[in-house]
């Protein structure tokens, strides 16, 4: 299993496209052969990493199915799916990526639902962070480098750019932006002291003791953040994928999402 990342929980994370292709091909043969337990390949936004690991651990123990994750920026995952990567479930951090795939016929009809929401926060280092009380402070001289997930492609960065444009700060802040591969990379840059501040999801802060929230976007003013999930049209394991989607809509999964700070958008299935 060279090249795969084995987590202490027993879950497996696929770091790249080629492994996703291989996992999908093998999984289809397992379902067609009528195997009792299936391997479900889930492409999910990086900001969902911790809650999905916990949900999957319990699900694996209860069902015997195996959940394999490819965790990255939603834009990266969408490109991989378009390129032919085989996966069962896509859990995106924005509606735009999901809609684009649905328009191309890559999403199974009737399976898409918006599950979660989040909020944007400005974070600084917990021990030596710059004094930031509002987005306007990001335009000041104390902030020279600001970490964002790529504002041209990655949902967290796109949401941040949209908000800063709305409050007429983007033109002043854009020269300071250090674009990162995904939102967790932006968080890591703040933790390491490589930037003065960052804009990430509120849920990302829950996993770090090295940063603190300096400001949170009010829900009535901030961008509308929505995490949709769906079965892929060419899922190698459609039945098992549907079962896992149903579990993600359960009250048990909702409790985990809330534990990690997500806002649940729909009523859960008991």
Please tell me what each predicted stretch does.
Residues 22-85, 92-95, 99-105, 111-270:
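Exported/periplasmic ABC-transporter solute-binding proteins
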Residues 8-11, 62:
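Intrinsically disordered/low-complexity terminal segments and short unstructured peptides
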Residues 1-6:
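N-terminal secretory signal peptides that target proteins for export/translocation
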Residues 10-22:
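Bacterial N-terminal signal peptides
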